[in-house]
Amino acid sequence: QAKPVLVLLRPENGLQYNIEDIKKFITTRTAAIFINSPMNPTGLLLEDRFLKEIAGLGVPVISDEIYHGLVYEGRARSILEFTDQAFVLNGFSKRFAMTGLRLGYVIAPKTCMRALQKLQQNLFIIC
């Protein structure tokens, strides 16, 4: 059973994560770190420095990148630019105003694809 741990964003850090705050919560039971950038509703982009640091922690990263196509200032960087051992959640629905269609996808390490295929087969069977 998963137990999420929230790490607060602080105004004095420009609402950016402090990597030391995250490290304090990592244990041998940590299954993954979940991030999203750009963040909704602020549009805040995670800094390259943070993405590099989070990728180097040795913990799988799940990155919600659904708003990457909706950045008007700066450049949204994917966690995949810093590690190939990450899961990226993205889709077409937000970017192309197709919200009713709910078209999404995951990019994952090759070693995890078979498990994801099994999960997908059980989630999307129509009776």
Where in this protein do the model-derived segments appear?
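Substrate-binding/gating loop at the entrance of the active-site cleft, primarily
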Residues: 1-4
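Structural signal for conserved beta-strand scaffold positions within catalytic alpha/beta enzyme cores
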Residues: 6-8, 78-81, 88-90
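Active-site phosphate-binding strand-loop segment of PLP-dependent enzymes
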Residues: 9-74
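Short secondary-structure boundary/capping segments
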Residues: 24, 78-80, 124
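Short, structured coil segments at secondary-structure junctions
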Residues: 57, 82-84
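Phosphate-coordinating loops and pocket residues in cytosolic domains that bind phosphorylated ligands
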Residues: 68, 72, 81, 118
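Conserved core segment of the aminotransferase class I/II
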Residues: 84-127
